[in-house]
Amino acid sequence: QNAETQGRYLKTFTKHRESGILGTAYYEQKERQERVMTQKRIRDYGIMPGRIKTGKRNKITDVPGVRVGHCTVKEGEIHTGVTVILPGPDNAFLNPYTAAAYVHNGFGKSCGLIQIQELGTLETPIALTNTLNVGKVWDAVAEYVLRQCENDGAEALSINPVVGECNDSRINRISLRAIGAGQVKKAFDAAGEDPEEGDVGAGAGTICYGLKGGIGTSSRVIKVGEKEYTIGVLVQSNFGATEDLMVDGRPLGREILEKYGNEAEDPVKKTAFSEQDKGSIMSILATDLPVTDRQLTRIIRRLGVGIARTGAYTGHGSGEVMIGFTTANRVPTKGLRR
């Protein structure tokens, strides 16, 4: 009987693989895992930022329950994507997370921040994308939550999807608005505990300090009393003037310009070697500290200090938005009419 069952399984697997239904997803996951394993990070080059120990992966997903997924689109003039951050495995709408939002510089088009600031809760996953796709991604996240509630036998009459953005138009044909429900679904389906970094998802079209930007993440483990807690951060970086770039206290941006600036072709200088601090950076913080929304606000306001340590000065056109949530303090709403 086991042999017969196994035979049927293999036959079905082969059929799905040949049709592309199962094979494509399997190989995409395999390739993604291989890229994560071989991807170099700043510590691989001997640069050790900070003095507090990192989490196991040094990623936002070191906070238990948090997952991240990307969908990257690169076709012709399109270089963009979407990234989703899931705060936990269950339906956040029925059991919201204590959260906070802080706008360091408001040159941006993010959605959902006002209600977070007013109520101190997060009731949906957080999505990041490009500026002109905020509305389409908002709609896809709302649909995702509606389907969750339907499966849970709950009614959702008012939803607050949280969507952040950066303008990636310098290397992406942003007017094509390439991100929609299909790409958001792929990002949700790809969500896991060991996400890729760099030129992926919402970071596929971003530029940072005139160089290639992208998605970055890290984590730190702190001790309060006798108990350890984790703080993780994920950023979508798209800001900064090249000459201002600092790495571990070294004026690397100026060194790059002195060494390569005169050799670069004019189009490269215009696109890559930025003269102004403009763009944006979205910063998402997750923790398992049992803090209130007010305390979370105090924490995420410090993210601006970290950004400044890389050389930025919060230019006029640099939208700098911080969102934080804790997995420790939930605010149940099940049974309430929303």
How should these model regions be labeled?
Residues M37-R338:
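Alpha/propeptide regions of enzymes that mature by internal proteolysis
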Residues E4, T12, I21-Q29, Q33:
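Short, positively charged and aromatic/hydrophobic N-terminal segments
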